[in-house]
Amino acid sequence: MSQLFSHKIAPSPIPDNISVVDLIDNYFTAYNSARLREICHLLAQKVMQPGVTVGLSLSGAMTPTGLGISALAPLVRAGLIDYIISTGANLYHDLHYALGMDLYASHPFVDDVKLRQESRIRIYDIIFDYDVLLETDAFIREVLRAEPFQRRMGTAEFHHLLGQYARAAEVELGRSHSSLLATAYECGVPIYTSSPGDSSIGMNVAALALEGSQLVLDPALDVNETAAIAYFARESDIPDQEGKSAALIIGGGSPKNFLLQTQPQIHEVLGLEERGHDYFIQITDARPDTGGLSGAVPSEAVSWGKVDPNGLRDTVVCYTDSTIALPILTAYVLNQCAPRPLKRLYDRRPAMIEELQRLYLQAQFKQQAEAKLGKEQMPEPQSTEPVATYPCGTPIKGRK
């Protein structure tokens, strides 16, 4: 049979006692429902298996909906997500739940002027009091004045410390499993923010800087740590089996790029051998034809070295609302996958960075030695014009 045909569509009535697995396997037959089925199958059968390091990027207002707690935290506790790159806004709104604050389901057709007069905030069809922001801000500022925050650090360490305080707030309120930050802290899952100033957390960090706070969030640490995680994903815990790297992308935006740029950072900038992520899975509503990164497809990422060209068959993009897809794929995966041992990548960061630095400096020394040897063996050049090179030392073709 032609490879164009996957399986025959054989519709049957949906029974009244159907499970989520049967619903997806047998009734998500075409269009984006079929893409969502393919994502569920790829996650369950290949991605969330031993030997694969799974990075999640998170954009859009996901945590205000409760999905940080209901859909993502269970995946973290099951060892199915190893590191996260999120907008700061998602982590800020996650704190509302850790602090026991109330958000309400409403509808989008409300009078926003009246909401402003009543000191209420709207995120599409979610409504909450302005005091939720003020009390969360007060919590953040109180926490960030503590001694552990008075130094330079990356956002993984910053969010780990913040998660520790969020967990303490949960305990004080007699709550559990009410915060993605607290869950990541407990499970040793590092959380990065690609643009830490672009959120209310970053705004409060900036305010404290005016008071003389010594806290500085260093993006260079984040770039190198995430690159190290992606690079050492090749080291599998399974004997005689090479590890793999997966990118699970919810939405798009800056977190998507920060997750994918780990690969160019390795081969383009650091000059180390790398082939790209092995798996690429995205839930998005962004179109590819406008040129934005949010809608860029996996095959385009191949041209940048972000995705392994041999792994294109293991890439899926589903064009739908993430609040529809995320609960479905979480339910499917938790049903079909056994929990994995926690990698606790947060604790392994220093060792990975030390080894990445050693390999980078070794590669630099080798390139410089080869360049020197080549120069000694070459006849005296007629021109002394400098040759333009990439940071890793590779000459740029056609450039002087």
From Swiss-Prot:
One of its GO terms (cellular component) is cytoplasm. Pfam families: DS. The keyword Transferase applies. InterPro entries: Deoxyhypusine_synthase, Deoxyhypusine_synthase-like, Deoxyhypusine_synthase_sf, DHS-like_NAD/FAD-binding_dom. One of its GO terms (molecular function) is deoxyhypusine synthase activity. Belongs to the deoxyhypusine synthase family. Residues 372-400 are annotated as: Disordered. It is an enzyme of class 2 (transferase). This is Deoxyhypusine synthase-like protein. Keywords: Transferase.
